[in-house]
Amino acid sequence: MTRPDLFFVPCDDAWGGHRMAYWQWGDPRSAHVVLCVHGLTRQGRDFDMLAQAIVARAGGDVRVVCPDVVGRGHSDWLREPAFYQVPFYAADMVTLVDRLHAEQPVATLDYVGTSMGGLIGLVVAGHRELPLPVPVHRLVINDVGPTLDPAALQRIGTYVGQGGRYATLREAADAMWALSSSFGPHTPEQWLELSRHMVVPASRRSADGSARLAVDATPAEPSGDPRAEPEGPLLLHYDPAIAVPFRLATPEAAAQGEAALWALYDAITAPTLLVRGAQSDLITVATAQQMAQRGPRATVVEFDGVGHAPTFVDPAQSAAVTAFLFD
């Protein structure tokens, strides 16, 4: 299986609801679900390499589900940007798991979250009142923790929501690499593939600005050859308004959020793996050490030469996750 299937799940909100897209790899009949949730400006196809590694490690008996968090990828954009926040996203994840459970009962639920996806995972795994059909069995947190370095947040804030318009996929990839070299070493081909799903042809924007594409297409892929060069101009896939709550955050709100995240982390009982880029500027060594000593006492794996955040394109990074999930 070299390409995932794309589905949509209706989610509740105060404006009549929104659709969340999700990509599914593996056996749709499997009772073992691995939910992989991406970072702030990313989308579900970030996990293509990891998903295939998980399916191979499980001998095919697994469903790997990679949503496009609302406001990204194929998912709808919210009418009220103030709700682009972790608690809202976590509610959508519960809706998604309920949908998966209704289609085929879920016996084992594992969770992998990168950056923002990891913070969502703290809520999903640590909030005892969430109506999940099954609890999180194993949790992987990728380069994030309850305490976030303010300078790193300021760095991220300089580019989130700035948009971008590119004539070619290569131009888009080069522009994104200038902002994302902390992801660590990638070949030009690997980076181009990661970038392919980060842009959408301007002609495919719907009236509200979001990407409304055919069910069997990906944002930068025309129908037919998935490696074909998309027609420009190309735009970034996400709603620029995801930056609104990010930029309105105050020091007081940040302190309250940090305390709440530590409380959630301390409530987690699932075995937890923390993957950290050794040169990460978002999660410090001190925070990683705290996460190893309290709450679920995470096992910490670091990758040298990588900052924020590991992409799991490197086989060694994927192997760390599959070993944790299956050994």
Where are these regions (language model features)?
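Short beta-to-alpha linker loops that shape the active-site pocket of alpha/beta-hydrolase fold enzymes
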Residues: 68-73, 145, 304-307
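Active-site loop/oxyanion-hole signature of alpha/beta-hydrolase fold enzymes
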Residues: 14-15, 49, 55, 63-112, ...
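Conserved hydrolase catalytic core segment
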Residues: 106-150
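Active-site glycine-rich loops that stabilize anionic/oxyanionic intermediates
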Residues: 39-42
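Conserved serine/cysteine hydrolase catalytic core
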Residues: 200-293, 302
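Alpha/beta-hydrolase fold catalytic core
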Residues: 1-35, 56-63, 102-105, 316, ...
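Helix-rich cap/lid subdomain of alpha/beta-hydrolase
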Residues: 144-238
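Catalytic histidine-centered segment of alpha/beta-hydrolase-like enzymes
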Residues: 306-315
